[in-house]
Regions:
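Intrinsically disordered, low-complexity segments
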Residues: 1-2, 511
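His/Asp/Glu-rich metal-coordinating catalytic cores
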Residues: 2-89, 94-271, 275-309, 336-341, ...
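Extended hydrophobic/Leu-rich segments
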Residues: 11-13, 33-35, 72, 468, ...
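Generic N-terminal simple sequence motifs
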Residues: 38, 522-525
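Ser/Thr- (and often Asn-) enriched beta-sheet segments in non-cytosolic proteins
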Residues: 42-44, 141-143, 150-152, 157-159, ...
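Histidine-centered active-site/metal-ligand motif
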Residues: 92-97, 165, 183, 392-403, ...
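Hard-cation-handling environments
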Residues: 223-361, 368-392, 398-521
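Non-Sec secretion/translocation targeting segments of pathogen effectors
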Residues: 524-535
Length: 535
């Protein structure tokens, strides 16, 4: 589709990736803003919302895939293409929403200015640094946006509205004189979460009264009709579990960005006279990033957090050690312990392992195998499923809107035109659409990516469609050669991997071109990864 197809005034929305038949991930959306000047001529702006990866599991051809940057960003050293994006807006800091940034840069693209919340900005910087993108001229500008702040970007007013998901998570209200779109990002409603600003239903009601033409909303858990469990209730159930482990070591495995759950575990530790100990570089870095962004876990817990190196003299039954690995990621702490890897936390018959997170489909098999290996150590393993079977109650709740949350969002916003479900496979999208119908809102159901949707105050129409290629990325086995750190810069990250990039079709099933030349700098022979874990 040419830019001529976007000449009429309105907001043009396109899902570049995220509505995938093969599972959630790679979330990215393009918004073209078309207004008219005093002479009635079109004035164009462009926004990109999120740029994430889709993780591939199970030994396939690629480690991850993401939307092709070719039609989104400008290449370094080349003039800006017509209508290059004015801004990149990030809703939050999960990899499926920002993990492709480093890959686009390594492929030779220049990113537009990024606008996001403070914690999101911290994790963007961490992601780029860990990928070896340390040169200032390769890193994008990052502009911090405060909760409920409105910025001008691409010819639109964009308001970052706090939602409940993780620190700094934001929905976006994109408004022009022609139309208004509410882009939910990942969200749910839980006023008991400890970190960051909470979603405000009354604020959302006021936003709806100001006029919203289309709601673009998260579908991940829209089909779940089970009763919702708050983080406060999860915390109480964790307290009961931990209180019953007298004389035993307790180790909990979480996701690296699941910091509200870390707070709940910390409160459970405090209630039982234990000290929270954090193990694993990624989790330690994320907690420090949250602190810099104004989200203090120690303040929320009401007790200090120790690193493993500072807890050597702490008796095992007076600690609660939290590490990564809830999704059985290969290098995460809990996975390494299950595999008895050198330097990993010891888990044995006198250990209770708590995994307060349900496995999602892409990692279900790896998670099952990890739990089996933990069981084989003789440890007492309490997964989210087992906790309910044992009568403790729920210790996990989806971070995404379940059916009742989805219904509440639509009831508060009351879009004038349509609701369009995103961030889901076809079944999840249809469940979201059915909820919209049930409250009298017309759904616009797009079961795949590529449709171009024009939004105005008079109507919403599909005005075209594009086939959108993906990029498949796989580590080559080589690593980047980084220059020595200058005084005051701190230690360089471990040598980052160099990736091979292939262009795939819109389904990710067929290769269109191989070995797209990346920008990676000189390579050197890989060396074994340094063990970051403290015994």
């Amino acid at each position: 589709m040419s830019t001529a197809d976007r000449n009429q005034a309105g907001i043009y929305w396109q899902s570049r990736m995220g509505n995938n038949a093969d599972g959630i991930g790679g979330n990215c959306h393009r918004y073209d803003i078309v207004t008219t000047d005093a002479q009635g001529q079109p004035v164009r702006g462009r926004l990109v919302v999120d740029y994430g990866i889709k993780i591939h599991n199970g030994g396939g051809a690629y480690d991850c895939s993401f939307p092709s940057p070719e039609a989104l960003f400008a290449r370094r050293g080349q003039p800006d293409p017509a209508h290059a994006p004015d801004a990149l807006l990030l809703t939050h800091s999960h990899e499926d929403h920002l993990g492709a940034l480093k890959h686009a840069i390594d492929m030779g693209y220049r990113l537009p200015p990024i606008h996001c919340a403070p914690f999101t900005a911290e994790l963007v910087r961490k992601s780029l640094t860990s990928a070896g993108i340390i040169e200032t001229d390769r890193r994008p500008e990052i502009h911090i946006v405060k909760p409920n702040e409105t910025i001008m970007a691409g010819g639109a007013e964009v308001t970052f509205v706090p939602v409940d998901h993780l620190p700094g998570a934001s929905a976006l209200v994109i408004r022009t004189k022609e139309a208004a779109v509410f882009h939910s990002g990942d969200y749910k409603f839980d006023k008991t979460m400890a970190l960051g600003d909470r979603a405000d239903p009354e604020l959302l009601r006021r936003i709806g009264k100001q006029g919203i033409d289309m709601v673009v909303s998260d579908s991940t858990a829209a089909g779940e009709e089970r009763p919702k469990v708050s983080e406060r209730e999860i915390g109480k159930h964790l307290q009961t579990i931990v209180a019953g482990q007298q004389g035993r070591a307790v180790v909990a495995g979480v996701l690296g960005t699941q910091l509200d759950r870390v707070v709940s575990l910390g409160r459970a530790a405090k209630a039982s006279g234990r000290t929270l100990v954090v193990s694993g570089a990624s989790l330690v870095q994320n907690i420090a990033a949250a602190e810099r962004a104004g989200h203090s876990l120690e303040k929320a817990i009401g007790a200090p957090i120790l690193l493993t190196k500072d807890a050597r003299d702490l008796p095992a039954d007076r600690a609660l050690v939290v590490t990564t690995g809830a999704f059985a990621q290969p290098m995460a702490g809990l996975t390494r312990s299950a595999d008895h890897q050198p330097g990993a936390l010891y888990i044995g018959r006198d250990t209770t392992v708590i995994i307060p997170q349900r496995a999602i489909p892409p990692v279900a098999e790896a998670h099952r195998q990890m739990v089996e290996r933990l069981d084989a150590t003789g440890a007492r393993v309490i997964t989210a499923e087992r906790a309910e079977e044992m009568g403790y109650g729920a210790i996990h709740q989806s971070g995404h809107a379940i059916a009742s949350d989805t219904r509440l969002l639509y009831t508060l916003l009351k879009p004038r035109q349509v609701a369009s479900p995103i961030h889901g496979a076809p079944g999840q999208i249809e469940a979201n659409a059915e909820i919209a119908r049930s409250v009298g809102i017309k759904p616009l159901v797009l079961r795949d990516n590529g449709a171009v949707v024009r939004v105005t105050s008079h109507g919403v129409d599909i005005v075209g469609r594009e086939d959108l290629p993906r990029i498949g990325a796989r580590e080559t086995g080589d690593v980047k050669q980084l220059p020595r750190a200058k005084p005051g810069e701190g230690r360089r990250p471990r040598p980052p991997a160099i990736y091979r990039y292939d262009q795939l079709d819109s389904t990710g099933e067929r290769i269109q071109s191989r070995n797209i030349e990346p920008y990676a700098g000189p390579a050197r022979t890989p060396r074994p990864p340094r063990d970051l874990r403290v015994r």
